Every structure is written in structure tokens, then in C-alpha cells.
């Protein structure tokens, strides 16, 4: 089962990716992890990626596709894989298709922007332990304090409203067009496309995914 997850940052993809991986026994493929592994391994592709990144440039689509092809040929991808964060653009989706990387399901996590802002901006973390709270959905017993240690909770830099809104603008400009792209691919019979209501509680979203994926 080969799956692509689409949806804005904060739409709940990460939580459900864990569930899909465990239930269907497939690995999650992150392009960031692949790039780091390639650079560390010192492979030919890794050297190319390192040179580009050291120059402060973005790694080319061709290079990322080559890494994806290599990664999905590995034994743990025999039953499929889960792609999150790639493709991000229509040219990347086209390049995947041309490289013969077919996908069984494209799942779009649909959550309104304002709810995403609410979800992310309300996060508070206890950095030493990694415990995460939310001022509205999962508040600590004492406001601003960790339940276990009583230490101060902080807000991640990435969770500040200005940063979140900027990421949402980027998502709508670059990645949202993929929704139309994969809807057409599904109409042509090349993949299955499903929209998931990401505003529902985690357990309900999970149940919806089980119905879709079988």
C-alpha cells in the first residue's frame, strides 16, 4: 500500500501517520531523513546533496526523486510506504509519475486555517521531558506549569502565530494545487483520492482511515 498524505502543517497528519504505519506495517518516508542519511553515507547522491545544501541552495527535484526511488526499493518498503512532505509541488508529482513511482492512495487532511492556527498557537511544551500541552484542548493542571515537575512551560518558535500563518500561505501557494492534481489522477483511475475531515477527534479520524484503506 503506497500512500501520500496531503494537508497543511497542524492538520493532524503526523498523529495519523503513526497509526497507518503500525496498522499496515509500512514505513514513513521523509525526504529530510533521506537527505540526512544520504549525506551521512557519503554515497554519490549524498555528495551531490551535500554540495548543494552547503551552498545554501535547495536540493533539485531530480535528486530527491532519485533518493525516493532508492529508498522505496529497500526491503522494508516491500508492502508499501507512506510519503509525508513530498511531493510538495506539481512538478515534483509529475517527476514521480515519470519515474514510475505509482501511488495507491492520496489522503487529504482537511482542516480550516483558523482551527490550525488555534491548534498550533495554543501548544505549550515542557522542553526537558518533551511533554506537550494545549491551553484549550489539553491544559496543564496549573496554568503555564508542567504537571509533573511544576516547571515553566514554553512556546516553540515554530508555534508562534506569525510563523504558522506564513507556513499556511506557503502551503496554499505551493502544495494545495496538488489536491486538484491528484483528484484528476483519481478520475483517470491512476490512484484513489480521499478527503479526510481532520477537525474530528483523533479516534474518529482513525476510524475513517480504516474505512478508506480497508
Curated annotation (Swiss-Prot):
The modification N6-acetyllysine is found at residue 192. Its main location: cytoplasm. The keyword ATP-binding applies. CDD domains: ADK. Residues 122-159 are annotated as: LID. It is found in: Cytoplasm. AMP binds at residues 31, 36, 57-59, 85-88, 92, 156, 167. GO terms for cellular component: cytoplasm. ATP binds at residues 10-15, 123, 132-133, 200. GO terms for biological process: AMP salvage. Pathway: Purine metabolism; AMP biosynthesis via salvage pathway; AMP from ADP: step 1/1. Residues 30-59 are annotated as: NMP. It catalyses: AMP + ATP = 2 ADP. Pfam families: ADK, ADK_lid. Keywords: Acetylation, ATP-binding, Cytoplasm, Kinase, Nucleotide biosynthesis, Nucleotide-binding, Transferase. GO terms for molecular function: adenylate kinase activity; ATP binding. Its EC number is 2.7.4.3. InterPro entries: Adenyl_kin_sub, Adenylat/UMP-CMP_kin, Adenylat_kinase_CS, Adenylate_kinase_lid-dom, P-loop_NTPase. It comes from the Bacteria. Monomer. Belongs to the adenylate kinase family. Consists of three domains, a large central CORE domain and two small peripheral domains, NMPbind and LID, which undergo movements during catalysis. The LID domain closes over the site of phosphoryl transfer upon ATP binding. Assembling and dissambling the active center during each catalytic cycle provides an effective means to prevent ATP hydrolysis. Catalyzes the reversible transfer of the terminal phosphate group between ATP and AMP. Plays an important role in cellular energy homeostasis and in adenine nucleotide metabolism. This is Adenylate kinase.
Amino acid at each position: 500500500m503506497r500512500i501520500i498524505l496531503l494537508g497543511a502543517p497542524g492538520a493532524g497528519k503526523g498523529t495519523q501517520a503513526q497509526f497507518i504505519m503500525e496498522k499496515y506495517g509500512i514505513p514513513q518516508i521523509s525526504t529530510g531523513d533521506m537527505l540526512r542519511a544520504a549525506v551521512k553515507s557519503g554515497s554519490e547522491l549524498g555528495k551531490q546533496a551535500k554540495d548543494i545544501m552547503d551552498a545554501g541552495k535547495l536540493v533539485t527535484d531530480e535528486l530527491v526523486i532519485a533518493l525516493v526511488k532508492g529508498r522505496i526499493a529497500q526491503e522494508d518498503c516491500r508492502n508499501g510506504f507512506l510519503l509525508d512532505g513530498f511531493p510538495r509541488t506539481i512538478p515534483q508529482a509529475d517527476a514521480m509519475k515519470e519515474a514510475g513511482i505509482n501511488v495507491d492512495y492520496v489522503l487529504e487532511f482537511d482542516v480550516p486555517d483558523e482551527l490550525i492556527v488555534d491548534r498550533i498557537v495554543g501548544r505549550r511544551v515542557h522542553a526537558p521531558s518533551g511533554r506537550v500541552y494545549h491551553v484549550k484542548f489539553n491544559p496543564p493542571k496549573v496554568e503555564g506549569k508542567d504537571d509533573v515537575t511544576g516547571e515553566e512551560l514554553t512556546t516553540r518558535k515554530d508555534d508562534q502565530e506569525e510563523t504558522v500563518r506564513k507556513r499556511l500561505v506557503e502551503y496554499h501557494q505551493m502544495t494545495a494545487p496538488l489536491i486538484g492534481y491528484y483528484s484528476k489522477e483519481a478520475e483517470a483511475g491512476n490512484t484513489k483520492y480521499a478527503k479526510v475531515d481532520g477537525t474530528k477527534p483523533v479516534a474518529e479520524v482513525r476510524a475513517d482511515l480504516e474505512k478508506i484503506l480497508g
